[in-house]
Curated annotation (Swiss-Prot):
Sites marked Transition state stabilizer: 34, 133
Protein name: 2-C-methyl-D-erythritol 2,4-cyclodiphosphate synthase
Lineage, highest ranks first: Bacteria, Pseudomonadati, Rhodothermota, Rhodothermia, Rhodothermales
NCBIfam families the record matches: ispF
UniProt-listed CDD domains: MECDP_synthase
Organism field: Salinibacter ruber (strain DSM 13855 / M31)
Length: 157
């Protein structure tokens, strides 16, 4: 059994959708990024890559490569899973937290869990997604950006 940890941050900007866990969440701003900027899925992908000692998301899908422009992070996560499996491992579980002041994510968490479980090809009850604020502190508290953290376990296939 191996453990991985992932972290991602993107700025909130006008004119982009807010996509978290593969769900378009209604909000007046979205996340800036080369891909769809889904911080939750990026953190999960980095956790999986880290657990398998395969580097980070940027090494596999560089923001300098035009083919990843506006990429769907669910598709990127599926590719990460393929690479983890090719290295001889299978995802076992994921625990993730999104840090943002608003909007509230509770109405969307079940769909996020389903999307992550589908990408990882395992049961939804092996995926935990939580959301919290930073009580007005820091860049998240000032609503300048959104952060996500994820931990995962993988096991030999």
């Amino acid at each position: 059994m191996r453990i991985g940890f992932g972290y991602d941050v993107h700025r909130l900007v006008e004119g982009r959708p807010l996509i978290l866990g593969g769900v378009q969440v209604p909000h007046d701003r979205g996340l800036a990024g080369h891909s769809d900027a889904d911080v939750l899925l990026h953190a999960v992908a980095d956790a999986l890559l880290g657990a398998a000692a395969l580097g980070d998301l940027g090494a596999h899908f560089p923001d300098t490569d035009a083919k990843w422009k506006d990429a769907d992070s669910q598709a990127l996560l599926r590719r990460v899973v393929e690479r983890v499996q090719h290295a001889g491992y299978a995802p076992h579980n994921v625990d993730a937290t999104v840090l943002l002041e608003r909007p509230k994510l509770r109405p969307h968490v079940d769909e996020m869990r389903t999307n992550i479980a589908r990408a990882l090809s395992f049961p939804r009850d092996a995926v935990s997604v939580k959301a919290t604020t930073t009580e007005g502190i820091g860049f998240v508290g000032r609503e300048e950006g959104v952060a996500a953290q994820a931990a995962c376990t993988i096991q030999s296939a």
